[in-house]
């Protein structure tokens, strides 16, 4: 099952794609997270999923991938709570930086002010008057938490996962390097593209390997596989839940693979 939010002349609302059918959820069931949290335990059975959608007023928009991919997507969650990010979580990325892989997850935080949806303009620091031009990209698999987690086992963590989406941790490197903490290079307003689709865990397996690709003006600048992760999604969620309660709608970005970030710096004319 795939979840998303769209916006058109009728406003914004949630949609889902299940068994080649596109369903539109009524406005009363939006935002998406509220609907999912209410019924998540029943979505494991396909028959239950269809029944729940119909019983709650979901209507069929049509069928097929072509229709789904043509929808006017916006970011899938309006206001995520916590955004926890893992650094150095790909072996090839650590190697290209001449660093050892961490013994424990290297974590930092983002805030919702940084997020934008698909197709939105990244607010470049140079355009804000800071003069910074050392901006580049980090494509990442992002976990969307679907249920509360505290001191969770890896199995419990996966059971609480709503699904997977994509995030690009666009970073301002000169500001990031001003201290040993990465915070100020990672939290600029409107610099982190997120979404558009949340894919349920039964459809993909990051441990087996999902390809991550980042293109700048149609040129591939990063290509990696989630099979290269140091800490798996289950391990990250379980680890974080040992010291912090994760709530529905929280995001965990799982790190970025190696790539070419230095030959071209991102500017407002580029398409990421």
Where are these regions (language model features)?
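Short, structured patches in soluble enzyme cores that scaffold and shape functional sites
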Residues: 7, 110-112, 126, 137-147, ...
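A generic local secondary-structure boundary/capping motif
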Residues: 4, 73-75, 95-98, 122-135, ...
């Amino acid at each position: 099952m795939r979840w998303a939010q769209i916006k058109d002349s009728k406003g914004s609302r949630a949609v889902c794609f299940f068994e080649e059918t596109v369903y539109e959820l009524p406005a009363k069931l939006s935002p998406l997270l509220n609907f999912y949290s209410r019924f998540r335990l029943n979505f494991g059975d396909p028959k239950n999923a269809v029944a729940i959608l119909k019983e709650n007023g979901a209507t069929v928009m049509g069928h097929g991938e072509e229709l789904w991919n043509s929808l006017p997507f916006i970011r899938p969650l309006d206001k995520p709570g916590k955004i926890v990010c893992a650094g150095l979580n790909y072996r090839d990325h650590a190697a290209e930086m001449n660093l050892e892989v961490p013994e424990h997850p290297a974590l930092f935080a983002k805030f919702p002010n940084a997020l934008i949806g698909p197709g939105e303009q990244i607010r470049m620091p140079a355009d804000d008057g800071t003069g910074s031009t050392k901006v580049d990209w980090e494509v990442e698999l992002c976990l969307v938490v679907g249920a509360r987690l505290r001191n969770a086992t890896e199995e419990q963590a996966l059971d609480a996962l709503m699904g997977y989406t994509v995030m690009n941790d666009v970073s301002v490197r000169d500001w990031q390097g001003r201290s040993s903490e990465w915070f100020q290079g990672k939290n600029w307003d409107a610099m982190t593209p997120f979404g558009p689709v949340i894919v349920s865990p039964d459809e993909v397996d990051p441990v087996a390997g999902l390809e991550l690709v980042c293109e700048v003006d149609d040129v591939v600048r990063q290509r990696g596989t989630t099979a290269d992760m140091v800490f798996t999604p289950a391990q990250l969620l379980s680890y974080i839940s040992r010291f912090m309660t994760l709530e529905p709608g929280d995001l965990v970005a799982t790190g970025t693979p190696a790539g070419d970030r230095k030959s071209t710096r991102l500017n407002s004319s580029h398409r990421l």
